[in-house]
Amino acid sequence: MILPVFIKPVSNNQIFVKYNDGLEGNINLSFLFKNFIYQDLKNEEIFKTVCIDKETNDIVWANNITICKDMLYNHLKLLKLADNLKIDLSKL
């Protein structure tokens, strides 16, 4: 099972996450802010509370906002693949 093993906030919109298979990198989460559920993450103090839930291994914040670890893994994998193929995803 692929699980996150380390996470930290990098900026108000980005986190660094590392998975147990070695995949790691920064993920900009600003795309989540369009959904009202994630609006609190715009607050830098809340954003900085990011951690890995010990029971579910999901990515969580102090105010009970959760992001699926598998979604983030696949998102990061896609970002790495696009980078390797020299594809600018911002132009799609």
PLM regions and their residue ranges:
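Motif-centric detector for short Cys/His coordination patterns
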Residues: M1-L92
